[in-house]
Swiss-Prot record:
InterPro entries from the UniProt entry: ATPase_NBD, Chaperone_DnaK, Heat_shock_70_CS, HSP70_C_sf, HSP70_peptide-bd_sf, Hsp_70_fam
Keywords: ATP-binding, Chaperone, Nucleotide-binding, Phosphoprotein, Stress response
Protein name per the record: Chaperone protein DnaK
SUPFAM superfamilies: Actin-like ATPase domain, Heat shock protein 70kD (HSP70), C-terminal subdomain, Heat shock protein 70kD (HSP70), peptide-binding domain
Phosphothreonine: modified positions: 198
Gene: dnaK
């Protein structure tokens, strides 16, 4: 059977590996290096990838593309994208669909197309080594990549001529690599993955099951717009400001100077991991009317650490959340594994050690571990390795908007994937012919404060009173973390489904804010939930009150009808405001008016021998108004589609 290769498609560097026998081989590229710069250049009609593209970057800044992974699956308007626009020498543009693309030589290119060039290089590297055609691969992505970003990565693979058999999370792949030759029994590890453009942390349990290994992800957290590029940019910003003070020239306006600064900043950052100071010397960086300008600035390790201290601090909060979600403390962690080139920085290692209370492992190559793990997963899928079971998770809650604007979770965050879950909902109005289903991702109670992934409609629902139709909504998330949602009318069997293909990705700020907001605004969420519940109970009571007056007919006096109508109007007015206590008071007032009426009607019906099936509690509102058959059914807020066909 043909080999399934493992590819780490990185922001700064990429790597390819394959399992041979019982060992994983990290494959050297044509230049003899085990990693390849994730850089693509367009020059004289030729496409350069890797080291050759990097070498000519200074002389061809506008057509040399790097850190493209930061754009994949993202909207042009994302704050994170806007921030990068001023820091890269190439041109980021807004595509027709609103996504962030790039423009090279007047040609618009999608990030998927550009990433495909890197994947082609990885594919060719593997083919040259194996001496056979490679068509299948496992590709890694940051654990916090959302549906759109995962879809875009699969599309890049397809463009590169690869059948992507599985998308797996980078920290999980690193744990696979770490656990491959470790036979030390059960252990819980933390994988801290600070790469070129993204940060992830996963808490993973490695269990020994009769000689086989089970790698189970307990929780994951992260930041999809935090990585080595941000460390470079912090140093670049400092150099630009220092030069501006000395020479009164803004280097950001010069693409050539910006590219030279980028190269120098990256080199200086690496040097400062092993030395206390370095000199950045860029002669003829620019020129003005007074002549050429030279940039000579000394940078100490302490200065760099001061510039990036906030970036390092931003990685610790996700670690805290991941531990909390896993139900563990730092003392439960046996090993801390560092992955990603930026994790080599002494300050990063120091802060990680301080947080976890133990020195990180030094026996895992941070540049190669992810590709090694991907190759192991590829071997599992091809049948070449059968002693490893991988259980990954989805990073954020998935649900739909229900009555009152509430997000009703279908699949909770940190659920093991693949997973399929269903819940039954109903209509919000009598004779409602269709329902709109809005799918959200996030941790807030109010649906619209989360990320809308997509929506679709289920129509042709037979006329029926509200609460009677049974609409089964199913969420199916596959092993790649890609979601499919379906809705089925249980009475007719009619079904509608959607493969979630959002045009935009979740920005780092959005994802981090979702979880942080959910914790920081717990009280606000509780109040909103209480308000939504009060409104739902009020709406149910109003509906049953109107039905009671209509059904009882002449058994209700005119004065009683007036009292009910007045109380209904007052309750309707109360539901339009945000005062929970007022809604509850008006609800109770309406119940107090209704109870004597329905009780009297019930007694009269009993005396006449016709009380069978009549329940005075049916008009009390809240849950009491629901039929027994509807137990477990949640009212869903759907947009009513008016049927114009009379």
């Amino acid at each position: 059977m043909a080999k399934i290769i493992g590819i780490d498609l990185g922001t700064t560097n990429s790597c390819v590996a394959v399992l041979e026998g019982d060992k994983v081989k990290v494959i050297e590229n044509a230049e003899g290096a085990r990693t390849t710069p994730s850089i693509i250049a367009y020059k004289d009609g030729e496409i350069l990838v890797g080291q050759s593209a990097k070498r000519q970057a200074v002389t061809n800044p506008k057509n040399t593309l790097f850190a493209i992974k930061r754009l994949i699956g993202r909207r042009y308007e994302d704050q994170a994208v806007q921030k990068d626009i001023g820091l890269v020498p190439y041109k980021i543009i807004k595509a027709d669909n609103g996504d962030a693309w790039v423009e090279v030589n007047d040609k618009k290119l999608a990030p998927q197309q550009i990433s495909a060039e890197i994947l082609k290089k990885m594919k060719k590297t593997a083919e040259d080594y194996l001496g056979e055609t490679v068509t299948e691969a496992v590709i890694t992505v940051p654990a916090y990549f959302n549906d759109a970003q995962r879809q875009a990565t699969k599309d890049a693979g397809k463009i590169a001529g690869l059948d992507v058999k599985r998308i797996i999370n980078e920290p999980t792949a690193a744990a696979l690599a770490f656990g491959m030759d470790k036979k030390e029994g059960d252990r819980k590890v933390a994988v801290y993955d600070l790469g070129g453009g993204t940060f992830d942390v996963s808490i993973i349990e490695i269990a020994d099951l009769d000689g086989d290994q089970q790698i189970e992800v307990l929780s994951t957290n992260g930041d999809t717009f935090l990585g080595g590029e941000d460390f470079d940019n912090a140093l670049i910003e400092y150099l630009v400001e220092e030069f501006k003070k000395e020479q009164n020239v803004n280097l950001k306006n010069d693409p050539l100077a910006l590219q030279r600064l980028k190269e120098a900043a990256e080199k200086a950052k690496i040097e400062l991991s092993s030395s206390n100071a370095t000199e950045i010397n860029l002669p003829y960086i620019t020129a003005d009317a007074t002549g050429p300008k030279h940039l000579v600035i000394n940078v100490t390790r302490a200065k760099l650490e001061g510039l990036v201290a906030d970036l390092v601090a931003r990685t610790i909060e996700p670690c805290k959340i991941a531990l909390k979600d896993a139900g563990l403390s730092t003392s439960d962690i046996s090993d801390v594994i560092l992955v990603g080139g930026q994790s080599r920085m002494p300050l990063v290692q120091q802060k990680v050690q301080e947080f976890f209370g133990r020195e990180p492992r030094k026996d895992v190559n941070p540049d190669e571990a992810v590709a090694i793990g991907a190759a192991i997963q590829g071997a599992v899928l091809s049948g070449d390795k059968n002693d490893v079971l991988l259980l990954d998770v989805t990073p954020l809650t998935l649900g739909i908007e229900t009555m009152g604007g509430v997000l009703t979770p279908i699949i909770e965050k940190n659920t093991t994937i693949p997973a399929k879950k269903s819940q039954v909902f109903s209509t919000a109005a009598d004779n409602q012919p269709a329902v709109d289903i809005s799918v959200y991702q996030g941790e807030r109670k109010m649906a619209q404060q989360n990320k809308l992934l997509g929506n679709f409609q289920l129509g042709d629902i037979p006329p029926a009173p509200r609460g009677v139709p049974q609409i089964e909504v199913s969420f199916d998330i596959n092993a790649d973390g890609i979601l499919k949602v379906s809705a089925k009318d249980k009475s007719t069997g009619k079904e509608q489904s959607i493969q979630i293909k959002a045009n935009s990705g979740l920005s780092d700020a959005e994802i981090e804010a979702m979880i942080k907001d959910a914790e920081a605004n717990a009280e606000e969420d509780r109040k909103f939930e209480e308000l939504a519940k009060a409104r739902n109970e009020a709406d149910a009571l109003i509906s049953s009150s109107n039905k009671a007056v209509k059904d009882l007919g002449d058994k209700v006096t005119e004065d009683e009808k007036t009292a009910v109508n007045t109380a209904v109007s007052e309750l309707e007015a109360a539901t339009k405001e945000n005062d929970v206590e007022a809604i509850k008071a008006k609800t109770e007032a309406l119940q107090n008016i209704l109870m004597p009426i329905t009780q009297r009607a019930y007694e009269q019906a009993q005396q006449a021998g016709g009380a069978e099936g009549f329940d005075p509690n049916a008009f009390q509102g809240g849950d009491a108004g629901q039929q027994k058959a509807d137990d477990g059914v949640v009212d869903a807020e759907f947009t009513e589609v008016k049927d114009d066909k009379k």
